[in-house]
């Protein structure tokens, strides 16, 4: 199985102070980093939040993203024009809905810590299964 990481998954990967940091790393070991993908939308979100919330400079955020990308399996280079489902009727849900569309269009699962995204393409990142 191959996964598109959402913004919070990328943040959990990089930032040790994320409440999901340990869970993400355990999950990533289980599924294999070669199966983890990014896209322009999630990478831009990672840069924005790393700078705005974490306090990284642009150079620090860019370097952190470049380091993460060395350990991923791929990058979704083409993204469809948004065709959002009805459940994305609130502005706060548009990015999540778009990422489900990108994942589906590229035959990926959307990996997230957000249990509120109710879509069949979503894979909730949880504790590693033994």
What does each model-identified segment do?
Residues 31-34, 71-72, 105-106, 120:
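Structured helix-beta-strand junction loops
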Residues 1-38, 53-63, 129-130:
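Short, well-structured N-terminal submotif of metal-dependent ribonuclease cores
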Residues 120-130:
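Active-site regions of enzymes building and remodeling cell-envelope glycoconjugates
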Residues 70-115:
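Active-site neighborhoods of divalent-metal-dependent phosphate/nucleic-acid chemistry enzymes
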Residues 38-43, 95:
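Short, conserved alpha-helical segments within structured domains
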Residues 9, 42, 98, 116-117:
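Alpha-helix capping/helix-boundary segments
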């Amino acid at each position: 199985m191959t996964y598109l990481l959402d913004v919070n998954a990328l943040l959990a990967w990089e930032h040790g102070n994320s409440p999901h940091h340990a869970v993400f790393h355990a999950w990533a070991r289980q599924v294999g980093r070669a199966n983890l993908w990014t896209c322009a939308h999630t990478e831009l979100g990672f840069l924005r939040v790393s700078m705005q919330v974490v306090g990284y400079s642009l150079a620090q955020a860019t370097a952190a993203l470049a380091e993460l990308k060395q350990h991923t399996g791929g990058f979704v280079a083409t993204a469809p024009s948004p065709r959002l489902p009805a459940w994305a009727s609130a502005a706060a849900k548009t990015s999540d809905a778009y990422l489900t569309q990108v994942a589906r269009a590229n035959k990926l699962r959307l990996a997230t810590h957000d249990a509120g995204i109710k879509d069949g393409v979503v894979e909730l990142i949880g504790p590693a299964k033994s």
